[in-house]
């Protein structure tokens, strides 16, 4: 049988230039172009000097423009584990040094860590974080009103959120279960579970949570309802986010429906996958453009955002090279569309206070996240 069979569990992204690969060459997952380059470079004993500091192949965006620097390309081949095996030299050595007795040699596969393997660990960690968030969202029932400063100082509160309290919300000042506030609390836990979070200054952690937890929450609950094939965002219990009485008030219903359907529309249009959602959520969180963030914080977030963006672009290109760039851009555009949620949220609570409860409660974290005094 002729042809090339690609194993479904084998990495198919070239570890050197991030183009499409068809298997291992010289012990590293690589494309045919990099395989031939390494062979020629080894034969020619390349010693080119890099004019750009030796970092031409260190970038994340190698899909669209493969650098021409031979020195950096060869160095990356060697660093990733490419080894040239000359069969004639091996045979000559074997003939010159015969073994006194026949022996059985067990060939043990070498475990080579490629960029594709590293990327797969990202998905495992992100999937676990998201699953924990969703499971906690199904049971969380806590009546607290912390600020983002409080949340940074307290560390993780996930164990508290997983022990629901008995609360009759209609008898509290909030009047209804604050799914929005509770969801943002869990988005904060996702941020705290990321590897770089503890490397940020305390002031940068507060700024990060204040600026990204709200958007991350809206993206996450939209995805939760999308995979359950719902037409709008629902609570994890399958019930409405708001009491039925509010849907009976025409002005409130219109704005509430806008809030609950807007984040789901692009997910439904793109039929976004779980991996795409997880990466987009990280791109939303790793925002280096937050005003007031320290230079070290901006650099840290920028580097992580570039990593997640690179993996997302790779996925789109491998899935369909022709439509990949367009899909990549459309997924990133969801980030900008989420900015509307704070505006719509403000309108929702203004409406609730005008037509339903004049003293409608607005939590500290949502006050800070929306930079206003209204939310649900």
From Swiss-Prot:
Positions of NR C4-type zinc fingers: 14-34, 50-72
Gene3D superfamilies found in the cross-reference section: Erythroid Transcription Factor GATA-1, subunit A, Retinoid X Receptor
Highest taxon above the source species: Eukaryota
DNA-binding region(s) in UniProt: 11-89
Molecular-function GO terms, alphabetical: DNA-binding transcription factor activity; RNA polymerase II cis-regulatory region sequence-specific DNA binding; zinc ion binding
Record keyword Repressor present: no
InterPro entries, sorted: HNF4-like_DBD, NHR-like_dom_sf, Nucl_hrmn_rcpt_lig-bd, Znf_hrmn_rcpt, Znf_NHR/GATA
CDD domains attached to this UniProt entry: NR_DBD_HNF4A
Gene Ontology cellular component terms for the protein in this record: nucleus
Domain NR LBD, chain residue ranges per copy: 125-371
Function recorded in the entry: Orphan nuclear receptor.
UniProt record similarity statement: Belongs to the nuclear hormone receptor family.
Protein name listed in UniProt: Nuclear hormone receptor family member nhr-124
Protein encoded by which gene: nhr-124
């Amino acid at each position: 049988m002729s042809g090339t069979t690609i194993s479904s569990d084998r990495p198919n992204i070239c570890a050197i230039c991030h183009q499409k690969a068809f298997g291992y060459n010289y012990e590293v997952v690589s494309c045919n172009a990099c395989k031939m380059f390494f062979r020629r470079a080894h034969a020619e004993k390349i010693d080119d000097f890099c004019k750009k500091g030796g970092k031409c192949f260190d970038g994340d965006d190698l899909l669209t423009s493969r650098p021409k620097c031979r020195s950096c390309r060869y160095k990356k081949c060697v660093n990733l584990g490419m080894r040239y095996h000359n069969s004639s030299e091996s045979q000559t050595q074997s003939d010159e040094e015969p073994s006194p007795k026949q022996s059985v040699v067990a060939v043990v596969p070498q475990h080579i860590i490629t960029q594709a393997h590293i990327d797969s660990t990202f998905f495992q960690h992100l999937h676990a974080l998201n699953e924990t968030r969703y499971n906690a969202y199904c049971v969380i029932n806590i009546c607290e009103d912390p600020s983002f400063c409080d949340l940074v100082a307290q560390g993780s509160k996930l164990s508290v959120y997983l022990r629901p309290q008995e609360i009759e919300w209609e008898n509290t000042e909030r009047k209804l279960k604050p799914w929005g506030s509770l969801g943002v609390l869990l988005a904060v836990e996702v941020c705290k579970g990321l590897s770089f979070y503890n490397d940020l200054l305390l002031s940068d952690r507060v700024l990060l949570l204040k600026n990204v937890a709200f958007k991350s929450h809206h993206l996450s609950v939209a995805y939760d309802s999308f995979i359950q094939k719902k037409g709008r965002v629902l609570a994890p219990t399958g019930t409405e986010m708001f009491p039925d009485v509010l849907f009976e008030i025409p002005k409130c219903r219109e704005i509430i429906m806008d809030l609950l359907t807007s984040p789901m529309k692009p997910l439904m249009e793109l039929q976004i996958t779980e991996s795409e959602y997880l990466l987009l959520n990280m791109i939303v969180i790793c925002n280096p453009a937050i005003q007031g963030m320290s230079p070290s914080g901006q650099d840290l977030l920028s580097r992580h955002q570039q990593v997640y963006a690179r993996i997302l672009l790779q996925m789109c290109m491998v899935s369909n090279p022709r439509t990949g760039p367009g899909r990549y851009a459309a997924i990133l555009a969801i980030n900008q569309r989420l900015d509307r949620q704070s505006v719509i949220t403000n309108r929702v609570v203004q409406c609730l206070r005008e037509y339903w409860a004049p003293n409608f409660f607005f939590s500290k974290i949502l006050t800070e996240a929306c930079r206003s005094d209204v939310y649900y």
